[in-house]
Amino acid sequence: MTTTLHVRFSELDPYGHVNHAVHLQYFEQGRIEALAALGFGLLALQQRGFHLVVVEVHVRYLGPVAADDELDVVSAVHEVRPASARWRQQLRRGGDALATAEVRTAVTDRDGHPARAPDDFLAALRRLTSDAV
């Protein structure tokens, strides 16, 4: 699943590049939009009594991102477990990879305790499974 984003001036560091921490927001937006496209927006998940939280992130920065860049965040699920998923994502500009991320998300109940994800949510995550990223 691909999400297109545009770099905003407020995301730049003093050197004119996107600050490294902003990449995490880009990857998060990619995951959020991928889930929403499958009918699992974050508010809908909350209303059903569970939350999706990030428990681990590894980012590799491959090239600079600058003002006015149009970026694609490509998101795929690499592994689905009953209470977690491992995502692989790429930040691209014109087909060139600028950063990669591997993110583990976990499901919790309203109180923050680990929980098994509903079967329809797990099925949706499996539809995002790909080795392409």
Residues covered by each model-derived region:
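Small beta-barrel nucleic-acid-binding modules, principally OB-folds
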Residues: 49-66
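HotDog/MaoC-like acyl-thioester-processing domains
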Residues: 1-3, 36, 61-67, 77-133
